[in-house]
């Protein structure tokens, strides 16, 4: 692949951060390291900060049921911008208004187009639909929309194989589907970031600490982890849980911790900047993730790269990266506490294996896969038009 100009379209963008925003940033950095140019088309938002690459902002409005998310309400001058920039690739990181906009631009200009399937939209709609429609009615409508959308792009990128399988199982016909995980930067996330003073900030020095990282929303299912902390009170009385992240369900989870009688062993740290987050991974004993919403679970790879065993739910993308008894333990809803026990008991060997897993998903290795997906998109376009 020669040097490309890639135009990325983002439904979700800074100052809001979620998995899709982080994935897009990492992929853009990986491409730039390899000599490609990346420009971004994104919804404008209050409080925007400087960004390390050119961004073309479009007028947008806030999405009332999902704080921080914005919907582009007019196409603005996006067609003029695409024609002026003459990108080689249009890559959309979203399934809503930007997917429609970027597909329209791709069809008009005959530029190869890809969509990364970052979000299980069929499940997100249960939590965030602005319409008072029952799940059994709205979920089929979402799949209908997704089938129509994803068959029109040259390549669908799935962040993990289970997501590709799930799309195919739900009757999504795609020109091509490539599995391209988002890479983890092992220079940023590393056991070298261990800092014995970090846990002192939270009064946790000298204690075993499990870490939970993610937006505090209902679909992340922190309630399962809090329930496990109650179960672990008897045989792991010193174990504490450090919860990193903010979100709309924060108050709910704090009340639940209190109701379960585990408030004294759970610390809500709020949002941590990247440097502190890397230190948190390297300084705690293990990561726990109970979300069934993950298309990849970026936090899992960040933890593994930091030499941290992971207790993860046996669902969707998580078992792709967490291997039972090797670099962590898998659990079902009712067996989270037992998985935490197993990780704590065998953490030394799991730490070594965690690092080996992370190396397979380096930014460079994943960027090569992305380049191959771009080449495939050009082939598909040439073949079908």
Residue ranges of each PLM-predicted region?
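A short, well-ordered alpha-helix in the C-terminal region of glycosyltransferases
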Residues: 348-361, 372
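Short alpha-helical donor nucleotide-sugar binding micro-motif in glycosyltransferases
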Residues: 82, 150, 271-272, 279-284
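Conserved donor-binding/catalytic core segment of Leloir-type glycosyltransferases
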Residues: 204-229
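Conserved acidic donor-binding segment of nucleotide-sugar-dependent glycosyltransferases
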Residues: 323-334, 342-347
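Carbohydrate-associated surface elements
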Residues: 162, 183
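Short hydrophobic beta-strand element within catalytic cores of glycosyltransferases
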Residues: 309-312
């Amino acid at each position: 692949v020669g040097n490309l100009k890639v135009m990325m379209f983002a439904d979700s963008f800074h100052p809001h951060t979620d998995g899709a925003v982080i994935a897009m940033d990492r992929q853009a950095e990986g491409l730039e390291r390899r000599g490609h140019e990346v420009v971004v088309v994104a919804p404008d938002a209050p409080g925007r900060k400087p960004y390390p690459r050119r961004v073309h902002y479009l007028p947008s409005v806030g999405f009332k049921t999902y704080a921080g998310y914005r919907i582009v309400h007019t196409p603005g001058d996006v067609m003029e911008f695409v024609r002026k920039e003459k990108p080689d690739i249009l890559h959309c990181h979203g399934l809503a208004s930007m997917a429609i906009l970027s597909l329209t631009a791709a069809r008009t200009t005959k530029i190869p187009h890809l969509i990364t399937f970052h979000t299980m939209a069929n499940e997100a709609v249960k939590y965030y639909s602005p319409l008072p429609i029952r799940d059994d009615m709205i979920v089929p409508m979402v799949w209908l929309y997704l089938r129509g959308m994803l068959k029109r792009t040259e390549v669908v990128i799935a962040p993990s194989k289970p997501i590709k399988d799930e799309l195919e199982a739900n009757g999504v016909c795609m020109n091509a589907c490539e599995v391209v995980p988002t890479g983890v930067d092992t220079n940023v996330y590393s056991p070298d970031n261990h800092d014995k003073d970090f846990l002192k900030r939270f009064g946790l020095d000298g204690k075993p600490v499990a870490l939970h990282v993610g937006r505090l929303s209902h679909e992340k299912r922190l309630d399962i982890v809090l329930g496990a902390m109650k179960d672990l009170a008897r045989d792991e009385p010193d174990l504490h849980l450090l919860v990193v992240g903010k979100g709309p369900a924060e108050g709910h989870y704090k009340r639940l911790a209190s109701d379960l009688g585990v408030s004294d062993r759970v610390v809500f740290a709020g949002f941590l900047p990247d440097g502190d987050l890397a230190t948190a991974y390297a300084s705690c004993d293990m990561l726990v993730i109970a979300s069934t919403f993950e298309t990849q679970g970026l936090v899992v790879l960040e933890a593994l790269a930091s030499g941290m065993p992971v207790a993860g739910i046996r669902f969707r993308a998580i078992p792709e990266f967490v291997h039972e008894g090797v670099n962590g333990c898998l659990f079902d809803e009712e067996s989270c506490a037992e998985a935490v026990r197993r990780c704590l008991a065998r953490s030394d060997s799991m730490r070594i294996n965690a690092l080996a897993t992370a190396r397979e998903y380096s930014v460079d290795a994943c960027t090569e896969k992305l380049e191959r997906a771009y080449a495939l998109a050009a082939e598909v376009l040439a073949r079908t038009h």
